[in-house]
Design a protein with these regions (language model features):
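Residues forming the flavin
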Residues: 1-559
Length: 559
C-alpha cells in the first residue's frame, strides 16, 4: 500500500484557546507537504470513531494526532495496520507554558515537527514468523491438583493439552489425603478433597491427552516450537523407553512438592511411633483409624510438633503456609467420634491466614484439642510403651511433660523442582575435574562437585539449554522470575511453574495458581503465533538484527 500521512489537531481541552491551530496546520501541510490535515474539537469518544472513519476514507497509513496524552488511548483505539504517533500538546505545551505566547506557539510547532519527522522515518514492523508452524498445544508436567486444574482450564477454552505424570495414576498428594481443610464458608468443617471428581473430569475431556508412568526426557526449542520427548518412568515399561515425541507451544510445570526432612533433634526414624503428617494422612486414608506403628494399638493421645521440618537458616527456614492448618485438621481426625481422645499441638507460631482463622477457632472450641505455644526439647520412650514429650511453655516459661501414644511431625514443603543453573555448574565441574587447564581449576571444580553434588540426577524438564536443563531457582529451590510484577513468569519464556512447585500453598491456592498459569500459557502461544513478544515487552513485534561478526555462539540469545 502506498504511504499516506495524515495529521489531526485537537482544538478542545483548552488547546484551541492557547494556540494558533491554523498555524500548526500550516506547519504540517506547508513544511512537510502532508496531504491530509484536519482540526477536531475532541479526540476521544465519538470523535475517535470519526477520526477512524477519516483514516479509512482517506486511505491513511501513518497518522499524527496532536492533542492529549497518549496514555488516554488504549492499544486498540486505532486500526492495527495504521502507524500512529501522538503529540501531547495539552500536557507538554498548554499546561506548561503561558497561553497565546510566542514561545508557547514555537514549542507546539516544534513538537509537531518532531512527531511528523518520526512518523515519516518509521517503517512497518514485520513480525517474526518461524519457518515451522507454531503449535498452540500445551504441555502440563505433573498430575496433581495444580496440573489437573491447569490442564482442564486450558482444555475448556479449546486448546489441546498433553499431561505427563511420572506415577501410574493422577491426583498427586491430594489423592492421598483423607479429608481437606475447609475451602468455603463458614470455614469450620472438614471437606472431601474432590480430587477424584477432578481426575474424572480431566480423563473425560477430549482435548486432554494423558501420559502416566512417564517423564520429559528431553525438551528442545522455544515458545511455540517446544519439541518434547516423553519417555517411560517404569511401572511396566523399560525405564527411559521413548513413548512419543510431541511439539507444544508452552509448558506448565506443576511438579508439586515433597515433605521436608525432619529436624535432626527429633527422633524420626529412631522411634517407630514418631511419624510425619503425611504418614498420618495415609493412615486415615487407608482405614480411618489412627494406630501406633510399633504395636498396631489405637492411639488415643496424639501430639503434633509444628515446624518439624525446619532447620533454622541452614536448610528450611521459610514457612510452608499449610502445616498449621494440616495439624488442626488432623487434630480433628483424632477427636472424631472419640470423646476420650486428646490432641496436643506444640507450636511456636500458629499461622492460619485469611478465613482460615475461623477454622483455628473451630479447633480451639474443641475441649479435646490442647494448643500449647512451646518449644519441644525432647521426645523419648517411656515405661508405658508410649512417648513422653518434654517442652518449654514459652508463654509461662515453665517446663511441661506430656505422655502420648503417637507423635506427628509437621514437615514442611520442599518443591519438586530442579535448579537448572546449579546442574549446569555441576556438569561443567565434572568436565573440569578431568580436563582442567590447571591444578587450581581442577581443585575448584572438585569443590563445586562436593557443594552441588546433591543436584545430580534431579532434572525434570531436561531442557537442551546452555544455561541449564531446568528453570533457574530462587534461594529455597522454588523456580520463579524474581519479578513481583510478573506472576507466573519464569526466566525461561514459555515455561510457567505453578502450584506448590512455585510457592508453598494448599489445594485451593494450587487451583487458583494453576488457572493463572494456564492463562499465561495461552497468552504465550497466541502472542507467539502473531510474532509478538510475550515478556516483558508484551505485544512488541520488533525483532533484533544480529551482528554476526561479533557472535561468539554462546547461544544465550536463542535460549
Amino acid at each position: 500500500m502506498e504511504e499516506k500521512i495524515g495529521v489531526f489537531i485537537c482544538t478542545g481541552y483548552g488547546i484551541g484557546e492557547a494556540l494558533d491551530v491554523d498555524a500548526l496546520c500550516e506547519v504540517a501541510t506547508g513544511e512537510f507537504k502532508v496531504p491530509f490535515c484536519k482540526t477536531v474539537k475532541s479526540c476521544e469518544g465519538a470523535a475517535l470513531s470519526a477520526m477512524n472513519a477519516d483514516i479509512k476514507a482517506e486511505g491513511l497509513t501513518k497518522v499524527v494526532i496532536a492533542g492529549i496524552s497518549p496514555r488516554r488511548y488504549s492499544s486498540t483505539a486505532f486500526p492495527p495496520e495504521v502507524m500512529v504517533e501522538m503529540v501531547g500538546l495539552r500536557e507538554q505545551v498548554v499546561w506548561c507554558l503561558p497561553p497565546n505566547d510566542e514561545d508557547t506557539q514555537m514549542a507546539a510547532a516544534d513538537n509537531l515537527r518532531m512527531y511528523i519527522t518520526k512518523i515519516q522515518q518509521r517503517k512497518p514492523l514485520v513480525p517474526f514468523q518461524p519457518e515451522d508452524e507454531v503449535s498452540k498445544d500445551l504441555l502440563v508436567v505433573g498430575g496433581g491438583v495444580a496440573g489437573l486444574t491447569a490442564a482442564l482450564e486450558a482444555a475448556k477454552t479449546g486448546y489441546g493439552v498433553k499431561l505427563v505424570e511420572k506415577s501410574d495414576h493422577l491426583g498427586g498428594w491430594l489423592a492421598k489425603q483423607h479429608k481437606s481443610i475447609p475451602t468455603k464458608p463458614p470455614f469450620r468443617d472438614l471437606e472431601d478433597t474432590g480430587i477424584q471428581e477432578l481426575v474424572a473430569e480431566v480423563e473425560a475431556n477430549p482435548n486432554i491427552r494423558i501420559f502416566t508412568s512417564a517423564f520429559t526426557a528431553e525438551t528442545d526449542g522455544a515458545p511455540g516450537l517446544f519439541d518434547v520427548t516423553i519417555a517411560s518412568s517404569g511401572n511396566g515399561k523399560p525405564e527411559g523407553e521413548v513413548i512419543e515425541k510431541i511439539r507444544v507451544g508452552a509448558i506448565i510445570q506443576a511438579t508439586g512438592w515433597r515433605p521436608a526432612d525432619p529436624r535432626p533433634d527429633l527422633p524420626y526414624g529412631d522411634l517407630e511411633d514418631v511419624i510425619l503428617n503425611v504418614d498420618l494422612e495415609a493412615m486415615m486414608k487407608a482405614d480411618g483409624r489412627i494406630t501406633r506403628p510399633s504395636d498396631g494399638k489405637e492411639a488415643k493421645k496424639v501430639a503434633f510438633i509444628q515446624c518439624g521440618g525446619c532447620s533454622g537458616k541452614e536448610k528450611h527456614s521459610y514457612c510452608s503456609s499449610i502445616c498449621c492448618m494440616t495439624s488442626l485438621k488432623q487434630a480433628l481426625y483424632v477427636r472424631e467420634g472419640r470423646d476420650d481422645a486428646k490432641a496436643y499441638i506444640f507450636f511456636e507460631f500458629m499461622r492460619t491466614p485469611g478465613q482460615y482463622e475461623d477454622f483455628y477457632r473451630r479447633a480451639q472450641e474443641d475441649d479435646g484439642v490442647f494448643l500449647t505455644r512451646g518449644l519441644v526439647a525432647d521426645v523419648a520412650k517411656n515405661e508405658d510403651g508410649g512417648l513422653t514429650i518434654t517442652a518449654t511453655d514459652t508463654m509461662l516459661g515453665s517446663e511441661i511433660q506430656v505422655k502420648v501414644d503417637l507423635v506427628v511431625i509437621a514437615a514442611g514443603m520442599i518443591p519438586n523442582a530442579a535448579d537448572g543453573e546449579a546442574i549446569r555448574a555441576l556438569e561443567d565441574a565434572k568436565v573440569n575435574v578431568l580436563d582442567g587447564d590447571s591444578e587450581a581449576k581442577r581443585v575448584a571444580a572438585a569443590e563445586t562437585l562436593e557443594k552441588l553434588g546433591h543436584h545430580d540426577g534431579t532434572q525434570i524438564l531436561n531442557l537442551n539449554y546452555r544455561q541449564g536443563p531446568d528453570l533457574p531457582a530462587l534461594e529455597y529451590g522454588f523456580p520463579d522470575s524474581h519479578f513481583i510484577c510478573f506472576p507466573y513468569e519464569s526466566r525461561r519464556t514459555g515455561i510457567y511453574p505453578t502450584g506448590a512447585a512455585r510457592q508453598p500453598t494448599d489445594g485451593m491456592g494450587s487451583r487458583e495458581d494453576a488457572t493463572g498459569a494456564a492463562l499465561k500459557a495461552i497468552q504465550c502461544v497466541e502472542m507467539t503465533s502473531r510474532g509478538e513478544a510475550v515478556h516483558p515487552r508484551a505485544g512488541d513485534t520488533s525483532y533484533p538484527d544480529f551482528m554476526m561478526s561479533r557472535c561468539t555462539k554462546c547461544k544465550r540469545c536463542t535460549e
